Amino acid sequence: MAKEGLGLEITELRLGLPDAEHVAVANKNGEKKNKRVFSEIDDVGDENSSSGGGGDRKMENKNQVVGWPPVCSYRKKNSVNEASKMYVKVSMDGAPFLRKMDLGMHKGYSDLAFALEKLFGCYGMVEALKNVENGEHVPIYEDKDGDWMLVGDVPWEMFMESCKRLRIMKRADAKGFGLQPKGSLKGFIESVGK
């Protein structure tokens, strides 16, 4: 296949492992073949391990991380350590960017409202949670089922478990979205806000 003497051996396409030398080996009948049998591979391994540096190389290969399974187990170990962190995406109508927020850092809806005000610079979020009928923006969230609900409709612990992402909508869009505050919501948020 490759032209001898033209230096095309490097670019030659062939079947086999990369950088593998095809050494012709004579079998018992004197025929030449390009495959190495298992005993030859084992003999080569024994020769390397009998030399002084071979034992260190075996240990080095043993400690070396290769392949995807160790990476997955590494990620699992790190996710166990960060189980208390629960990041959700937060978007605001009119803002050209999304943010991530850790819900685990907040103790309740009032802390969340202050953080949203600070994050997006839209003041009045705390008042919007306390007085649901007034305010320019309304914070809503998507739960596990994919339903959009008003922030504050459920107790804080249930909100923490079910929230997938947050969105700050304009009030007119939220009414068109079909989100109406519950009658008992106002008292609940006032008690949480104190």
UniProtKB/Swiss-Prot annotation:
Induction: By auxin and cycloheximide.
InterPro entries xrefs: AUX/IAA_dom, AUX_IAA, PB1-like
Pfam families, per database record: AUX_IAA
Residue span of region Disordered: 40-62
Transferase among keywords: no
Highest taxon of the lineage: Eukaryota
Domain PB1, first and last residues per copy: 85-173
Any one biological process term the GO annotation gives: regulation of DNA-templated transcription
Gene3D superfamilies assigned: Phosphatidylinositol 3-kinase Catalytic Subunit, Chain A, domain 1
Signal peptide: none
GO cellular component: a single term: nucleus
Localization terms from the record: Nucleus
Database matches in PROSITE patterns: PB1
Predominant place of localization: nucleus
Subunit structure: Homodimers and heterodimers.
Domain remark text: The N-terminal half of the protein contains two conserved domains I and II. Domain I includes a slightly degenerated ERF-associated amphiphilic repression (EAR) motif which seems to be involved in the activity of transcriptional repression. Domain II is required for the correct degradation of the protein through the SCF-mediated ubiquitin-proteasome pathway. Interactions between Aux/IAA proteins and auxin response factors (ARFs) occur through their C-terminal dimerization domains III and IV.
Protein's recorded name: Auxin-induced protein 22A
Origin species: Vigna radiata var. radiata
Gene label: AUX22A
